[in-house]
């Protein structure tokens, strides 16, 4: 343990954290208004549009939660896996690998079964799904169990030999007892505002740091579980991890400040709620894209569009990565280059696509605005 540094879990009274409710009462009111607006907007969607919005939100949550830790997941692979595991239709490009399937299973279990009790075995199964090889990178780790050993669990940054220690977690021998208290509180605490409870839970879990690795990802999965309980639905239409990623430096800064401070965690809760508000605002704006897709197909219901064209057009609305060109077209549809060019020219003639770029092989195409 670093001399002179007293972490939150070392204070008498831990884990009974404190906060000033008046400090974020206005933010809570704004969040609840936004939640109502978002669910009201989504309720205007048809069944297909609701599924599309949920698919996009869950894909973002999974991809961006991993990216917070510096891990890059293939977006199309994640989206295909989410769609398949939820039984949704999606015209994707890629089959998912075993690892991606496991990562997606963890998130789906959390949100689809948010009302089920949380126990150690459930967390262990999630951990095993995140580390199917028993390794984190090239390092062998203990999978599916609380961390063990005498070595201190530290959060560090910087080059080897010049590391900066941001945080040191409780000793491994204390994890079992601390997690028992945490799990009991997780399922029995019902007096707190559910969003405040989610913020407190987030800090509490990462402070214990119960696993050898993957603590951040599992913590954000637990956050989604509690948000699903708060919303009283397994339908996810916003992504908190996307906003955390946008403010990653602040995320780690506020966590570190809370972990190195006393039991008053008001600043952390306020930051968490402000970030949740941003996530809801971003999600509400994105519902415009879903409505845009619906308006597009309504406006073109009498236009002759073949299956190849329909497939690519839907992908353009559903979060197509990069720019569309004829090469991507024939790869997506497994057709010839000539067929791809004919399909594209046909959509240009019908006023649906327009060319951009320099022309020739570098020509890209985008949707014409309605």
What are these regions (language model features)?
Residues 1-370:
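FIC/Doc superfamily catalytic core
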């Amino acid at each position: 343990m670093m001399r002179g540094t007293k972490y939150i879990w070392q204070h008498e009274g831990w884990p009974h954290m404190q906060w000033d409710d008046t400090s974020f009462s206005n933010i809570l009111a704004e969040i609840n208004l936004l939640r109502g607006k978002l669910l009201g907007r989504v309720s205007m969607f048809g069944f297909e549009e609701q599924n599309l919005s949920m698919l996009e939100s869950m894909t973002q949550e999974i991809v961006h939660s991993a990216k917070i830790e510096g891990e890059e997941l293939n977006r199309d692979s994640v989206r295909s896996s989410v769609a398949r595991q939820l039984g949704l239709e999606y015209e994707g490009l890629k089959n998912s690998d075993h690892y991606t399937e496991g990562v997606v299973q963890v998130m789906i279990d959390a949100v689809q079964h948010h009302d089920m009790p949380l126990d150690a075995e459930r967390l262990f199964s999630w951990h095993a799904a995140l580390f199917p090889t028993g390794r984190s990178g090239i390092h062998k780790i203990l999978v599916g169990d609380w961390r063990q050993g005498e070595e201190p669990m530290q959060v560090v940054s910087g080059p080897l030999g010049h590391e900066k220690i941001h945080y040191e977690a409780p000793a491994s021998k204390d994890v079992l007892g601390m997690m028992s208290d945490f799990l009991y509180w997780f399922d029995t605490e019902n007096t707190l505002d559910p969003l405040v409870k989610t913020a407190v839970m987030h800090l509490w879990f990462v402070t214990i740091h119960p696993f050898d690795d993957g603590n951040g990802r599992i913590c954000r999965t637990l956050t989604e579980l509690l948000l699903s309980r708060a919303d009283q639905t397994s339908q996810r239409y916003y992504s908190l991890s996307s906003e955390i990623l946008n403010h990653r430096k602040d995320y780690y800064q506020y966590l570190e400040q809370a972990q190195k401070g006393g039991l008053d965690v008001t600043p952390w809760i306020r930051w968490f709620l402000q970030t949740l508000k941003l996530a809801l605002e971003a999600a509400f704006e994105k519902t415009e894209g879903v409505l845009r897709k619906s308006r597009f197909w309504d406006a073109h219901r009498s236009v002759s569009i073949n299956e190849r064209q329909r497939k690519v057009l839907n992908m353009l609305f559903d979060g197509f990565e990069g720019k569309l060109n004829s090469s991507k077209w024939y790869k997506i549809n497994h057709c010839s280059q000539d067929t791809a060019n004919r399909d594209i020219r046909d959509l240009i003639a019908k006023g649906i696509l327009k060319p951009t770029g320099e022309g020739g092989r570098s020509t890209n195409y985008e949707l014409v605005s309605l």
